[in-house]
Design a protein with these regions (language model features):
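Beta-barrel outer-membrane channel/assembly domains of diderm bacteria
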Residues: 2-111, 116-136, 145-156, 166, ...
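Short glycine/acidic-enriched loop and turn motifs that connect beta-strands
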Residues: 139-140
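Detector for outer-membrane/organellar transmembrane beta-barrel domains
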Residues: 154-282
Length: 334
């Protein structure tokens, strides 16, 4: 009996060790949308999405696979394999290789869509306080393209972070982030090698009492230059859906937004007011959004978002139209 108990204990410990470096995390959300336009037409839509992240680890090497399950997909599209990559160290170099996207917090992240590149590799190291790196992407046929080669650096200067990255024969990006006089500053410039194709983004935030105030803006030389469609800052983006600049809103070359956020009795309240700036011959399209979110005892978070937005691409002299959207979101992370 003792031998059986010892064997069982050993087996349990071995099993625990075997799975100790494998983890599964994720999140899920259910969304309801009620939209009414100027003509009085009302639509009701819903969406269910589950995201799962699998991570395996061996020493300094990790392997990540992220999956998205969407209720509205068919047999071919309901399951989307998103990020699939590994990270490791080779001497003093950090290596990330596979299919992965950049976030909106990355340099130029609020300007360019952080699309996934096939078989991308990112190699970086530190030289004192300076981080330098090289990033190489491939096309959908796994063919390495020179136009997808990027070098970058991040340098701390007097409490600020200065960043630069250059994509050969395409653009050079600059960014600074820091704080001055109680105001948090993030400013980024994309200088294109193509004439009249530069984009400036900046975001300023400060806290007054219990309220966080913000002002953010994007200023482009022309329409069609901004591809990010899932901003973490703006209530309305200069691009829609997916597809990068191919889905940029037509006749829009800028956006500005004022915001205020606070907490009231456990509810996080945010107000955003702004405007999509139109190109010559079109009307600017204003928008406002108020949202409230609260963590529930069940472990979920309930969010209610109301957005009133004018329609872009309405020519000067034409009657402006708008829409009102009520969104209810029930989300959980695990």
């Amino acid at each position: 009996m003792k031998k059986q108990m010892i064997a069982a204990a050993v087996a349990a410990s071995v099993s625990a060790v075997a799975v100790a470096d494998i983890s599964i995390t994720g999140n899920a959300n259910y969304e309801y949308f009620n939209t009414e336009n100027t003509a009085g037409v009302t639509t009701h839509t819903t969406d269910t999405e589950i995201n799962l992240s699998f991570k395996g680890k061996s020493g300094d090497t990790s392997v990540v696979a992220n999956l998205e399950i969407d209720s509205h997909g068919n047999a071919d599209t309901a399951l989307d394999i998103e990020d699939t990559y590994m990270t490791t160290k080779i001497g003093d170099f950090n290596v990330k290789a596979g299919n992965f996207a950049s976030s909106t917090s990355a340099l130029l992240g609020e300007i360019d869509a952080g699309g996934r590149s096939t078989s991308k590799v990112d190699i970086s190291t530190t030289l004192g306080d300076i981080k330098v790196g090289y990033n190489q992407g491939s096309n959908t046929s796994d063919i390495v393209e020179n136009s997808a080669s990027t070098v970058y650096a991040s340098i701390p200067v007097a409490g600020w972070t200065v960043q630069v990255k250059d994509q050969s024969d395409s653009y050079t990006g600059f960014g600074v982030a820091g704080s001055i006089g109680g105001v948090n500053v993030r400013a980024e410039q994309k200088n294109s090698d193509t004439a009249n194709s530069n984009v400036l983004f900046y975001n300023l935030t400060t806290k007054v009492g219990d309220v966080t105030l913000g002002y953010a803006a994007i200023d482009a030389d022309a329409s069609g230059l901004v591809g990010e469609e899932d901003s973490s800052i703006f209530a309305r983006e200069m691009a829609t859906g997916t597809g990068g600049t191919s889905n940029a809103r037509s006749d829009v070359d800028g956006v500005w937004q004022l915001s205020a956020a606070t907490a009231v009795d456990g509810n996080n309240i945010t107000l955003k007011v702004g405007e999509l700036r139109a190109t010559t011959g079109n009307q600017d399209a204003g928008f406002s959004q108020v949202s409230a979110s609260r963590k529930l005892a069940s472990g979920t978070t309930l969010s209610v978002i109301y957005t009133d937005a004018e329609t872009e691409s309405i020519t000067t002299g034409s009657t402006m139209t708008d829409s009102q959207t009520l969104e209810v979101d029930l989300a959980v992370s695990f």
